[in-house]
Amino acid sequence: MSYDVIVVGAGHAGIEASLAAAKMGARTLMLTLNLDHIGQMSCNPAIGGIGKGHLVREIDALGGAMGLLIDATGIQFRFLNTRKGPAVRARRAQADKAAYRAESKRVLEHQPNLQIRQASVERLIVENGGVRGVESQIGETFESPTVILTTGTFLKGLVHVGMKNYSAGRAGDFAAMGLSPQLAELGFRIGRLKTGTCPRLDGRTIDYSALEIQPGDEPPPAFSFRTRAIEREQIPCHLTYTNARTHEIIRGAIDRSPIYSGVIQSRGPRYCPSVEDKVMRFRDKERHQIFLEPEGRETVEVYPNGLSTSLPLDVQIAMVRSIKGLERAEIMRPGYAIEYDFSDPTQLAASLETKLVRGLFFAGQLNGTTGYEEAAAQGLIAGINAARAVRGEPAVVLRRDEAYIGVLIDDLVTRGIGGEPYRMFTSRAEYRLLLREDNADRRLSKLGNTLALLDSDAARRVQLKAERVRGEFARLSAVLAPASDATNAILAECGSAPIANPVRAIELLRRPEISYDAIIRILRIAPPAPFQPPNGRDRVGSESKVGTGPANPLNLDEAAELEIEVKYEGYVRRQAEAVERFKRLEETALPEWLDYRGMAGLSTEARERLSAVRPRSLGQAARMPGITPAAVSLIAVHLRGGRNRPPESVMRSLP
């Protein structure tokens, strides 16, 4: 059986990779160990969060599935960081895990050009430096010039609960044992990482009356630009805390922890530590937050977010029951840690194709990342580029100034993961004020439509939104708000100073405390003053006009984007100028054949790192660890000096 693209794995990376390739017309095969576990949420039942929510919005803008899937199956939706700047505001949704799996499978099964099979892939078929397909555990062969590995935690996965451990890709699923040794034989640098998960509690045994309730936002903020509205009833989460007794139980059993007893040597995510890590590392903290998150509408299971652990089951029970509201809680599934193999992502090109085997792509936790969203973003790009490789088209590579997806992949292929699972944060992006959640559609939907991932109707809606925001910006720049009692009463309600003379509406909106809604109220209740500055123009040259508020005011998403553009206009402009400087470095291409080892003036470390990674541009070289500004200057001088032709040996090998 022959295909254009084969995707190994049906987690969040595999879903996006398969759908992208199939939508682009590639005959695609998805292979998974278990057809009933497509889109499984192995850890917390949630999508989004700081940095992660930005990725989901970008995936959606490009035409990916994750945003639509969570909108269709979520049970609670919230905005995070609403009191902070717009660059770090993000959506987060609690998922109904069973519904998310079912919806993922339904979408995949109804996608043209996509076939789904249950099989355990044990070997890659590699010939003449290129992948030719895969072979399953029972000897089936599937042929394809491109293969995308999205293996998650399944490569030689080992689950730990206390001093007990067993082979598994996650609790309840077999590990994949054959691929790792073959990848190592092919020259891939294989390492070992760890992650963990929380015990699942029986919600019927929780005393919710003793806990702090956390409702969702109204109206629920959708992830997808294509979702019109979410009208389902939301389910609240609850908040509780560990205490001195909890910490005493953990410290008393720390010698039975596989992490602290030395059984587990690999490193886990720095920003998602186990509860035993938190207690041992932060001894001055009297308590730690525990968020009780329902796992779905049709189950009683509850996920105690913040209680990830690999302690023995008896210790987990004692620890849980020491917490307020959980005194009688029953554990339905124990928490555990899992070790698994990953591959050094610096052996990948920015397309996510491997440098060692032509046509072979890696995405997700195989590349050392952690999180559903990071995996989905990589899967989408790998699927796009595998389909384009089959057609002989150049790869799609997003820059750091274009998308968080670009930041994620550039970090991986340029810097690697530094020995611990990589998680996306807004702080990783240099131009985060330009890469906001609210403008992801404006940044990326045109590309999604060009790639045939985003339908034309959705692309037109994005264009219409941008036009409405631009139009309202222009209108508010021209309309004058009168210095009336009605205007000043509204300003006073907002805690803002009164005005003595007519003011352009856009200038009022620049005030931090003034919302777009307040501007609309001012323009409707107190119609703009019939005032014309000299020559009929205001001080920045736009025509001043008389009129009331718009017949069709902006909706919540449009208004949010307008407010940010207005209030942060100066900052946005400065970041845009910085991007232009960044582009100049990115546009200075570094030839693949460049001989760094023979480049005079470079340190031994720089020569080794540059030779290993082979950066595609001067900008990428500048971001590599161990590469100093002086080294970047040396490379630039080398290129400018005319020493940018390949040596004779390379010239002779060129066709």
Question: Language model features by range: what are they?
Answer:
Residues 125-141:
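Conserved beta-strand-loop-beta-strand element in the redox core of flavoprotein oxidoreductases
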Residues 19-123, 150-170, 174, 178-179, ...:
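Conserved N-terminal/central alpha/beta ligand/cofactor-binding core
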